[in-house]
Each structure stands twice: as structure tokens, then as C-alpha cells.
Amino acid sequence: MAAQEQKTLKIDVKTPAGKVDGAIELPAELFDVPANIALMHQVVTAQRAAARQGTHSTKTRGEVSGGGRKPYRQKGTGRARQGSTRAPQFTGGGVVHGPKPRDYSQRTPKKMIAAALRGALSDRARNGRIHAITELVEGQNPSTKSARAFLASLTERKQVLVVIGRSDEAGAKSVRNLPGVHILAPDQLNTYDVLRADDVVFSVEALNAYIAANTTTSEEVSA
């Protein structure tokens, strides 16, 4: 059977003025692959676990202060025998099997991380939720009002992931205070943030950087 040809998706590139400035291709190997839900769940779970601080700690009966005295004599009271006021059944006593500081991070292979990200982006692309723009605001002066109006013209959904180049300070300053908008550089793209967002907005610069970094080798993707 002949190998099935991969399709190439095309999306319009929008300007802050609302005009179409050409189109850009989304490679099928990155934006049209099957979404493996179990894989994405595993990667997101590992990513969220790695973000946990893990400094929680409780004291056992040997660590709480006090408790050297026997609360009452062994026999003759009619009550159950007790050896310390810091036993777990007493108020102020130690905690049994309580949490201790630990590392929650899990080892996830880079290929699995990259595959999960491709699946998440493909799901958004197939549903028309990936957008390309020339820039967030015209010129070098930040404008939250202009950026908000521009994003509203692209999508009415609330959670938006904006992927722009690290050098685009005007764009970052324009949207960093907008509710529901999250900003990432192309090398920071991850499965969790893509799935959490309703729409993903790429600048042409960031989209080209992501494609260039992942079409030759799909292993180098940030966790």
C-alpha cells in the first residue's frame, strides 16, 4: 500500500489592523498528528507533579515537644494504659504517617514530551484554534487596549495562549496583565499550557522558530 501523503494546513496571518497579510503553512508532522490522550495525560501529570514544592512536613511523636511524662499510672484507674501525652491519639500529639518533604518529579523521556505537545497542537489546529499574527501591537510602544481588541477579533474564547519571540517586549507588556492570557516563548511551549488554552496565538516569528526547531529533530522540546 502506498504511503499516505501528509497534508499541510494553511492559516491566514493577521495584522493588528485586522487585515490578512498572506498565509503560513503548518507542517502536518507537527500540527496534524493523532492526539494520544493517555500520553498527554501522563506528560501533563508529570509536569504538574514537577511543579510541586514538596516541602510539606509533619512531626511524629518523637519530634513534637514535650511528652516525656506518663499521663497517669499504669494500673488502678480503670482507663486504658497510656505511655505519653504526645501519642497520636492525644491532642498535641504526633502525626501518624503524615507527609514528609519529598521530590514529586517524574522522569519523562523527551520523545514522549514532544509527541504529547504535537498531539495537543494538532487538536487545536484541527479545530481552527491556532492563529498566526504579524505582531500584537504596531510599533514599539506597548498598548494593552490595542492588544485586547486584536485578540478579541481573533477569538471570543477566554483562555488564550500567546506565543511570541523573547525580543518582543512591546507585545509581552501589552498582554501580560490581561486576564486569561498566558505568554510563552516558542522554546517554552508545553502540553499543559496548550491544553489549558482555548486558542493558541503565534507570532510569525515564534511559529517559524518552533517549526524550525522541531522539523529536523523532534526531541529537543522543553518539559
From Swiss-Prot:
Residues 49-106 are annotated as: Disordered. GO terms for biological process: translation. Part of the 50S ribosomal subunit. The lineage of its organism: Bacteria, Bacillati, Actinomycetota, Actinomycetes, Mycobacteriales. This is Large ribosomal subunit protein uL4. Belongs to the universal ribosomal protein uL4 family. The gene is rplD. GO terms for molecular function: rRNA binding; structural constituent of ribosome. The keyword Transmembrane helix does not apply. Keywords: Ribonucleoprotein, Ribosomal protein, RNA-binding, rRNA-binding. InterPro entries: Ribosomal_uL4, Ribosomal_uL4-like, Ribosomal_uL4_dom_sf. Gene3D superfamilies: 3.40.1370.10. GO terms for cellular component: ribonucleoprotein complex; ribosome. SUPFAM superfamilies: Ribosomal protein L4. NCBIfam families: rplD_bact. One of the primary rRNA binding proteins, this protein initially binds near the 5'-end of the 23S rRNA. It is important during the early stages of 50S assembly. It makes multiple contacts with different domains of the 23S rRNA in the assembled 50S subunit and ribosome.
